[in-house]
């Protein structure tokens, strides 16, 4: 599709599940997206860094979303490996 300036634009950009790498379809209303921000330990305010995780409805239906989020957060260094 093109806009008024003649540039090609997409109406829908599909997301991928962070845990299973599946494409999250537009009709997957059970999927969630979590934005976890970095917090300054002294002031308690949000800094510029953040991490986004998208979990598809299939993972949530199986009850594995909490394990997947912990695994992804460990991999990104948000929580300790001994958690």
Swiss-Prot record:
Entry annotated with the keyword Lyase: no
GO process terms (BP): translation
UniProt KW keywords: Cytoplasm, Endoplasmic reticulum, Ribonucleoprotein, Ribosomal protein
Location of the protein in the cell: Cytoplasm, Cytosol; Cytoplasm; Rough endoplasmic reticulum
Single Gene Ontology MF annotation: structural constituent of ribosome
Gene3D superfamilies according to UniProt: 3.30.1230.20
Pfam families assigned: Ribosomal_S21e
GO cellular component, one term: ribosome
Keyword Endoplasmic reticulum appears in the UniProt entry: yes
Domain of life: Eukaryota
InterPro entries assigned: Ribosomal_eS21, Ribosomal_eS21_CS, Ribosomal_eS21_sf
Similarity annotation: Belongs to the eukaryotic ribosomal protein eS21 family.
Oligomer and partners: Component of the 40S small ribosomal subunit. Interacts with sta.
Entry protein name: Small ribosomal subunit protein eS21
């Amino acid at each position: 599709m093109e806009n008024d300036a003649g540039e090609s634009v997409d109406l829908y950009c599909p997301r991928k599940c962070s845990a299973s790498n599946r494409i999250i379809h537009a009709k997957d209303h059970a999927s969630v997206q979590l934005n976890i921000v970095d917090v300054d330990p002294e002031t308690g305010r949000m800094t510029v860094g953040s991490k986004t995780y998208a979990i598809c409805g299939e993972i949530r239906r199986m009850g594995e979303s909490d394990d997947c989020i912990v695994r992804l957060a460990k991999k990104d260094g948000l929580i300790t490996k001994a958690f």
